[in-house]
Amino acid sequence: MKIHEQNKIRIKLQAYNHTLLDMSCKTIIDTAHRTKVQAKGPITLPAKRKIYCILRSPHVDKDSREHFEIRSYKKIIDIYEPSSQTIDSLMKLNIPSGVDIEIKL
């Protein structure tokens, strides 16, 4: 079965909480399978870490510091040959507010 590259939707999901991201990916893939469309993914991209170093004391002690980190997780889902029913059902999905979605046609 040959997959045409011209007619696909690429959905990029990003979140700071990986459990919310996994639930969102599962709902998108379930919706694609319900409308009988081929979906590929979720493809996990490497997590990005940002580490912030902050002084504990407001005045003197430079030796006393605290480190905080923020991890961002990303996944990609490709939907091939989407129908109008698939697009309508994807637009009506309730995705948690902590998940950022970017859609490319």
Swiss-Prot record:
InterPro entries: Ribosomal_uS10 (IPR001848), Ribosomal_uS10_dom (IPR027486), Ribosomal_uS10_dom_sf (IPR036838). It comes from the Eukaryota. Pfam families: Ribosomal_S10. It is found in: Plastid, Chloroplast. PANTHER family: 30S RIBOSOMAL PROTEIN S10 FAMILY MEMBER. Involved in the binding of tRNA to the ribosomes. This is Small ribosomal subunit protein uS10c.
